[in-house]
Amino acid sequence: SSDVVLGKTWAENLAIGGKFASDSKLSVSGKATFEEAEVKLSTLWPDYVFASNYNLAPLDSVETFIQKNSHLPNVPSAQEVSEKGINLGNMDAVLLQKIEELTLYNIQMHKQMEAMKAEIATLKEN
């Protein structure tokens, strides 16, 4: 059985240290420590970032977004997180997307730097 017994009653939801959130099977008010936790996602893992048709935003538009909103595009603001919390699995996917985008930006910059080094070498020869 997947039920939890608390005393002499069966509980469908479990709350520890406070009241339970109506949409949760387990609610913990306070710190919880795990040796291991597994999150299973039904959403896309961001491998799509490396697809040839992925629309990587130009860095100047990312900068404009940050200046206007004080957070990265597609990442919740501090206020949103404070008010609504976050889904750990979805947040891991968002953070991985940002890491993969940073990798693509670094590759672009590396290619530009290599091209500039070659151009400088050519100019020095002439």
Model regions: which residues?
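Long, heptad-repeat coiled-coil alpha-helices used as oligomerization/scaffolding rods
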Residues: L95, L102, N106-M109, M116
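C-terminal intramolecular chaperone/autoprocessing and neck/assembly modules of extracellular spikes
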Residues: S2-K8, E12-M91, Q112-N126
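Terminal processing/anchoring signals of secreted or surface-associated proteins
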Residues: I16, V62, K98-I99, N106
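Short, charged low-complexity intrinsically disordered segments located at boundaries
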Residues: L88-E100
